[in-house]
Regions:
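Transmembrane beta-barrel domains of Gram-negative outer membranes and organellar outer membranes
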Residues: 22-206, 210-263, 267-346
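Bacterial Sec-dependent N-terminal signal peptides
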Residues: 1-27
Length: 346
């Protein structure tokens, strides 16, 4: 127990990969933590995130020792607009356990999905975009490099998904197959100095007899552009299972579209005690065309887009008319005239 507390202290003393607003020049992903950031991956960005983990569990009351292998995966895609993404997120786990009360006991095995969820996330509020549009304070270096009251206002998103759970699954409360909802409220604060605070409020399996309610708090620090550290606390409670989990780790940006990571998970209870190590990576296919200003919404946004569309149509019509006149009357298209010397003909 003492060694586990020491390890926990180390994790908390350190400071998920760097997460920033909307589409970014480098990959924006949720690994290696368990929380969801408030921002989407960006329109037309397809992103794959996955990892592999090994762990050990010991249950004091059941007298069992378990060796576990898990694979977690996530596929995320931004579509229609910058604020929206759809995703498939899940974890598959295989356990091999023995009864420690029996000498030379045979190992028993069980495997299934701990979670498998299809859902969508929408960014409801982004306080950072307007600041980017306004630009920095040109009269005060200090104002641009200190935490301000405005930094306490987070970006907010809502996630809604459906859990697909199979029959006779030892990792879920239901004995039969079911499809049930999951809701997540995510907030994200980006602070000066490369610090990010993410919080998730979670309501899971809320239509079942044993719903789960919980939270995740993640703190990220990026001391450089290619390296980041994180610590995380997750708590959840239901009649089926309750726990407090602590995670910590680091991630390295190999290229703007590729990141690798390593992390550790532990808890402080003994029914069961849990200790896991994980490695993983994330890669994105960046088909993003242009960044949108999210404030261009509603009537103002429609008028702006209508005006831009009208300008494009006007230019096309003008060019078409000029081409027709040039063909019929050998007139020079003013759009194509380079303004050069006429060779002295006039």
């Amino acid at each position: 127990m003492q060694s586990r507390i020491i390890l926990l202290f180390i994790l908390v003393s350190a400071s998920i990969s760097t997460v920033s607003a909307q589409y970014t020049e480098s990959i924006n992903n949720n690994r290696p933590g368990g929380s969801q950031g408030a921002f989407a991956v960006g329109k037309n960005v397809l992103q794959f995130e996955g990892g592999f983990g090994l762990g050990k569990e010991k249950h004091r009351l059941l007298f069992t020792e378990t060796d576990a292998i898990l694979v977690d995966y996530s596929v995320r895609y931004g579509l229609i607009k910058e604020e929206l993404e759809i995703s498939v997120i899940g974890t598959f786990q295989s356990n091999s356990f023995i009864d420690t009360r029996i000498t030379n006991a045979n190992k028993q095995r069980l495997s299934n999905f701990k979670s498998n969820t299809v859902g969508a996330k929408y960014l409801v509020y982004d306080p950072y975009r307007k600041r980017q549009m306004n630009g920095p304070n040109l009269q005060s270096w200090k104002a641009n490099n200190k935490t301000q009251w405005a930094d306490l206002i987070p970006a907010i998103s809502i996630y809604a998904g459906a859990n697909f759970e199979f029959a006779d699954n030892p990792f879920t409360p239901q004995a039969e197959s079911s499809i049930n909802p999951k809701l997540v409220l995510s907030t994200q604060n980006n602070f000066i100095g490369g610090f990010v605070l993410i919080t998730n409020i979670i309501a899971d399996r809320i239509t079942e007899k044993e719903p789960t309610y919980g939270y995740i708090i993640t703190i990220t620090h990026a001391p450089t552009e290619w390296f980041s550290l994180f610590v995380e606390n997750q708590g959840f409670k239901s009649d089926f299972y309750a726990d407090q989990l602590f995670r910590g780790g680091a991630s390295v940006l190999i290229t703007p579209d590729w990141q690798v990571d390593a992390s550790v998970l532990l808890n402080i209870k003994d029914t069961p005690s849990r200790l896991f190590g994980r490695i993983g990576m994330a890669y994105r296919f960046d088909m993003h065309e242009k960044d949108e200003y999210l404030e261009n919404k509603g009537k103002a946004g429609r008028e702006t887009r209508r005006s831009e569309k009208g300008k494009v149509k006007k230019l096309k019509k003008q060019k078409k008319d000029n081409q027709k006149r040039r063909k019929d009357g050998f007139q020079t298209d003013p759009l194509e005239d380079d303004g050069g010397d006429d060779g002295g003909l006039n």
